[in-house]
Amino acid sequence: MKKVLVFLWAAVILAAGAFAAVRYFVPEKAEPAKSGGSDLLVSITDQKLMTAYYENQNKLYEEKMTDYPAMALDRKKRILYYTNTDNSNVKHLIRLDLQSGKKTTLYSGDEYVDGLSLSADGSKLFMRYNLAEERNFHLASFDLKQKAFHVIYPSLKNKDKSVSYYQYNKANNRFVILHYSLKEDYQKTDEANSKGVPPEPTNMNISLADVKGQEKVRTIAKFINDTAISPDGKTIVFTESADDQKAIYAMDAETKKYKAIISDQRAFSLVDSAQPQFSKDGKKLYFLAEAKDAKLLEDETGSEARVRTIYSYDMDTKKVSKAWEKTNGIINTFTVIDE
């Protein structure tokens, strides 16, 4: 089931136990981006398995890692939303008021959620959503007032289609979704195992959707791990990883033609899911990679991973620059949070 938990790609995904250690950092106001770049929300886990949430260079909060972290930030109200798991394997969706330090548990249960995004009006959280007894993931919303989930795609009746990644576009209140067939995926995996060869890539579908419907853009038979769309909706990007070669592709949303724009270079190597994301003006593309001289870290369980860096790629000049890095931990995920 190589795509069922597609967000769990980092070596830092470990059984960390109870979250006894907690540190809260009082931010007076939103932290501005440095050097004219985009504002970033970053989740990073250190060698002691403490997961910290940063708004640019400002540490908002940290606690012991209990599961792969998901997060979203309401910059106007100064609210951090994040997830954790307790010793009984119960999942929690937490609301943290960054001004008062007050925590509110919005949801507790068996459902698994990740990939949090805050709606443009701040009334909902979007996420990948998985029922405990099911194998496929859905794109869903959580109403912050009613405290209720609503499945967007695919329907709960559909047990085959699974959302492996999505991105929410605040500019037009739409989504770009990466999804595939579980049946096809298992079939290709079983065939490869029986022949003793690597599996052929499952057909990955890239679709655009809103809360009411979905339209397919293109089906691509590649090992695709993520996707994103430009603010104007004209360019879709995705990361492909195959045979130790990784690249970020840009696809024209109208013609459906695509080409590689970023690949491994002397200075860095892309990670399996580079999490590409556009700046608000669409002029820069941010992504995750490992610098060639990246420090190797070992956590308290003995697991090793290299430090990751967030880079920016100028869509006009093609220049790549470092945007965010800390050498004492591994970046789990990040979000461009330009207002």
Regions flagged by a language model, labelled:
Residues 22, 26-61:
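An edge-strand/N-cap motif at the start of beta-rich repeat modules
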Residues 40-44, 80-83, 124-128, 175-179, ...:
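Residue position within the beta-strands of beta-propeller blades
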